[in-house]
From Swiss-Prot:
Annotated organism of origin: Treponema pallidum (strain Nichols)
Alphabetical UniProt keywords: Cell inner membrane, Cell membrane, Cell shape, Cell wall biogenesis/degradation, Glycosyltransferase, Membrane, Peptidoglycan synthesis, Transferase, Transmembrane, Transmembrane helix
Protein name (Swiss-Prot/TrEMBL): Peptidoglycan glycosyltransferase RodA
Entry EC number(s): 2.4.99.28
NCBIfam families: RodA_shape, rodA_shape
Top-level taxon of origin: Bacteria
InterPro entries: Cell_cycle_FtsW-rel_CS (IPR018365), FtsW/RodA (IPR001182), RodA/MrdB (IPR011923)
Cross-referenced Pfam families: FTSW_RODA_SPOVE
Catalytic activity: [GlcNAc-(1->4)-Mur2Ac(oyl-L-Ala-gamma-D-Glu-L-Lys-D-Ala-D-Ala)](n)-di-trans,octa-cis-undecaprenyl diphosphate + beta-D-GlcNAc-(1->4)-Mur2Ac(oyl-L-Ala-gamma-D-Glu-L-Lys-D-Ala-D-Ala)-di-trans,octa-cis-undecaprenyl diphosphate = [GlcNAc-(1->4)-Mur2Ac(oyl-L-Ala-gamma-D-Glu-L-Lys-D-Ala-D-Ala)](n+1)-di-trans,octa-cis-undecaprenyl diphosphate + di-trans,octa-cis-undecaprenyl diphosphate + H(+)
Length: 433
């Protein structure tokens, strides 16, 4: 495998990453300035230190042949699973989630770095399992995905756990799985959320107990619905096996998704905390709880709207400096940027991310081996999901899940994860035939 020279180093990816990180540091600093112009937070200094260390990590990974991860991915992935278990048992709580380990003020979020281990291991499995039956291979890939997701969800950290799903879907698409399988997973996830949240939606927005609420409140009714759906699905399976008719297949396909989704929702209402479920629906109308669950979205939309075309000027945003906006250096950093730099600033950030995404697609199109292509697709899925959900959350069109905007939001673990992932892209791009 040929490594190209310094003249062919991926400067475009490096400069894009540095531009986004620099913008992030600017607005982390802005978030730490109060209404009197005094700096009350030193988060920006920590972010600068983490950024410098992250660049070193990124360049180190870029110089390492990504093929050499193949024989080590099982050990790396197993190590992170053990670390996630350790975090669940002995970690410390930060923002309501037991997701950090460390000593004193120094701590790391293992679930962030586990994304990289997961991408490497899933890519390795999908490459070396191509001779296995399709459904068996897809099911095993699903189990590999559910393992870290379940451990992270138990912390409970819904936002970080949810990132693994789009990574899985994008990598399975690149691996060549039929669209019907990928579509089925998407439908099951959406239906599970629907069945889980529908009773709360009735109570919060309609303010009465409808059919969904009455079924959810009765364990007997819930089990009856589940077993009825499962039995009907089983009958459809038997009909398809005996007759071979196509419509039995599609009935089984549809009813199977509904049955699995409803069964998963029965577990979901016991796993998700009440505040997590409220966050998932409050974006539909934050005014129903403007001082609690809806406060973040309302203040974020005010900040973005007040920025106008050119913004109110750097360090001149009242929403952030008067501390109206919670989590403004992390989850809602895009709101500060839009308030102070306006629509133009938002377009600049959008353009930089678009450049990152298109360049990653270009790398994928030129990679000769499936392993490298799968790793790049996993990185793309991770970055794209973070971007869409975080920006959509600040605009009030996506639920609040606590997902940071990679490279911009404050936080060493997420920043290092993003930079290590960028280093993997550089390593792949530098070793094309």
């Amino acid at each position: 495998m040929r490594i190209r020279g310094v003249s062919d180093f991926d400067y475009l990816l490096l400069l894009t990453m540095l531009a986004l990180t620099s913008i992030g540091i600017l607005f982390i600093y802005s978030s730490g300035v109060n209404s009197e112009g005094h700096v009350i937070s030193r988060e920006y200094l920590k972010q600068i230190v983490w950024a410098v260390m992250g660049v070193v990590l990124m360049l180190s990974v870029s110089m390492y042949d990504y093929h050499r991860f193949k024989d080590r991915t099982t050990l790396i992935f197993a190590g992170f699973i053990l670390l996630l278990i350790y975090t669940r048992l002995f970690g410390r709580y930060v923002n309501g989630a037991k997701s950090w380990i460390g000593v004193g003020e120094f701590g790391i979020q293992i679930s962030e770095f586990a994304k990289i281990a997961y991408i490497l291991y899933l890519a390795h499995y999908l490459v070396y399992s191509q001779s296995e039956p399709m459904l068996k291979r897809f099911a095993k890939a699903g189990v590999i995905t559910l393992l870290p997701m379940a451990l992270i969800l138990s912390q409970p950290d819904l936002g970080t756990a949810s990132v693994y799903l789009p990574i899985f879907l994008v990598m399975c698409f690149i691996a060549g799985f039929p669209l019907r399988l990928i579509f089925a997973v998407v439908c099951v996830v959406l239906l599970t959320l629907l069945f889980t949240l529908l009773p709360l939606w009735e109570q919060t927005f309609l303010q009465y107990q409808g059919v969904a609420t009455r079924i959810a409140d009765s364990r007997m009714l819930s089990l009856f619905v589940f077993f009825s759906l499962s039995a009907t699905s089983a009958v459809a399976v038997v009909g398809y096996l005996l007759s071979g008719r196509k419509y039995y297949y599609w009935i089984t396909y549809a009813l199977g998704m509904v049955s699995i989704s409803y069964g998963a929702s029965l577990l979901g209402v016991r796993v998700l905390k009440p505040y997590q479920m409220m966050r998932l629906i409050i974006f539909l109308n934050p005014e129903v709880d403007p001082l609690k669950a809806g406060w973040h979205i309302i203040q974020s939309m005010i900040a973005i709207g007040s920025g106008g075309a050119f913004g109110m000027g750097y360090l001149r945003g009242p929403q952030s400096h008067y501390r109206f906006l919670p989590q403004q250096s992390t989850d809602f950093i895009f709101s500060i940027l839009s308030e102070e730099w306006g629509f133009v600033g938002g377009v600049i950030v959008f353009g930089l991310y678009l450049l990152f995404f298109l360049h990653t697609l270009s790398i994928m199109s030129h990679v000769d081996d499936l392993y490298g292509k799968l790793i790049a697709s996993g990185v793309l899925g991770m970055f794209l999901f973070h971007f869409v959900v975080n920006v959509g959350m600040t605009m009030g069109i996506m639920p609040i899940t606590g997902i940071p905007l990679l490279l911009l939001s404050y936080g060493g673990s997420s920043l290092w994860t993003a930079m290590i992932a960028t280093g993997l892209l550089m390593s792949i791009n530098a070793r094309q035939l």
